[in-house]
């Protein structure tokens, strides 16, 4: 399988989701352009799903349907799944992660499964705190690290560090939050704007 590129937005929101609920397992969906071509799968965004109702299939169905509709309007498809376990030193995908990732792969064969490495989830990690897996046959196996690309790793790590220091993770909304209060925006447009402004300010200082 080909290269995977992880954008600052997708990476940032995964980390902020895990940081908002550090003692809970969290999960979410990874999005890519529907018109993507070539060998590289570009993960441009993600949608945080749950921190307390991970195993409830009814809520998962509701979330998947809403993300599918919203993604189609934005020209995006569900291209992967991310998961952070509740246990600090556990980076292995459990049955739930494998089940959801497998379902996504049925509709998008190039889908990836990203496990967050909790031990490396610090403010500014030296190396990306992610383990990217790809579907080979009936198994999810670690992807060659040389095929996992970053649009700008240094920018991504600095951005997440700045957002965490500014406590932006407290404003992240996942589907659990939305289902508790439908006024809360699970697309996280406020956070997207912060990420865009941060990236723009660093470009301007370059």
Curated annotation (Swiss-Prot):
Pfam families the record matches: UPF0172
Domain of life: Eukaryota
Membrane topology per record: Peripheral membrane protein
Location in or out of the cell: Endoplasmic reticulum membrane
Biological-process GO terms, alphabetical: protein insertion into ER membrane by stop-transfer membrane-anchor sequence; tail-anchored membrane protein insertion into ER membrane
CDD domains registered for this protein in UniProt: MPN_UPF0172
GO molecular function, one term: membrane insertase activity
Subunit structure: Component of the ER membrane protein complex (EMC). EMC8 and EMC9 are mutually exclusive subunits of the EMC complex.
Role summary: Part of the endoplasmic reticulum membrane protein complex (EMC) that enables the energy-independent insertion into endoplasmic reticulum membranes of newly synthesized membrane proteins. Preferentially accommodates proteins with transmembrane domains that are weakly hydrophobic or contain destabilizing features such as charged and aromatic residues. Involved in the cotranslational insertion of multi-pass membrane proteins in which stop-transfer membrane-anchor sequences become ER membrane spanning helices.
Protein name, UniProt field: ER membrane protein complex subunit 9
Gene: Emc9
